[in-house]
Each structure stands twice: as structure tokens, then as C-alpha cells.
């Protein structure tokens, strides 16, 4: 699947699920990921629970629910590969500016390897 094409041509809602080192789970709404390679994405993450969890447990799932009838979308299984803290680099990835609504200046760019892709519903195998 061409992730760049998929996210450029889809409208929907993204949810990132993470867990801390003890397995305590969190889910949060996220914008479409930045596709940086064939199997690599990046997300801008503010200093909140999801970012803290990723620092202690590199695995996550990004669930994307396409807008429209039925249950269409994808689940991307992720593993953190890098974290960029330079504000100028982070800002280069921003699609829009909403002002600093809390933590924007402390946001990080987190890179993930996509280890598996499944449909929104079912096993897809």
C-alpha cells in the first residue's frame, strides 16, 4: 500500500493508541501522519501523555477511520525509530498554525516504522 497516496487522498479521523512501560493505555486524536518513506511516518507530538508513553514503550497503533458510510480505514502498527526536538525541523512539518495552544513550542517530531497494516475492521489476512 502506498501510504503517501492513501493519506493525501483520504479524509478521516486519526487516533493514536500508546501504552506506558506498565501497559497503561491511552488514545488520542491526531492529524494525518507525515509519510516520510515507504514504511515510515512521522507525527508531531506535544508534551502530553502519548509522547511520554512513546518515550517508555516504542510501540503504538495509529487507527484511521475514513469519512463516509460503513467502516473503512486502516490500522498502522508502529514502532518509534527516532525523535526530533529541533523546533525549526518540527515547524517544517506543520501543515497549519493554530497559535501556541499549549506545548506547541515544545512539540517533538516522532518517526515511526510501520511494521504492519491492517484494515479498520477484520484481520485482513
Q: Where is each model-derived feature located?
A:
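Binding-site signature for planar aromatic cofactors or substrates
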Residues: 1-125
Amino acid at each position: 500500500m502506498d501510504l503517501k497516496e492513501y493519506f493525501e487522498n483520504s479524509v478521516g479521523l486519526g487516533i493514536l493508541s500508546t501504552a506506558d512501560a506498565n501497559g497503561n493505555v491511552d488514545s488520542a486524536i491526531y492529524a494525518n501522519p507525515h509519510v516520510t518513506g515507504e514504511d515510515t511516518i512521522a507525527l508531531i507530538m506535544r508534551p502530553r501523555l502519548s509522547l511520554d508513553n512513546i518515550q517508555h514503550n516504542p510501540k503504538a497503533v495509529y487507527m484511521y477511520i475514513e469519512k463516509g458510510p460503513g467502516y473503512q480505514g486502516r490500522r498502522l502498527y508502529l514502532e518509534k525509530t527516532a525523535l526530533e526536538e529541533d523546533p525549526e525541523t518540527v515547524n517544517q512539518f506543520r501543515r497549519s498554525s493554530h497559535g501556541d495552544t499549549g506545548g506547541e513550542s515544545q512539540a517533538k517530531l516522532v518517526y515511526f516504522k510501520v511494521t504492519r497494516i491492517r484494515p479498520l475492521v477484520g484481520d485482513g489476512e
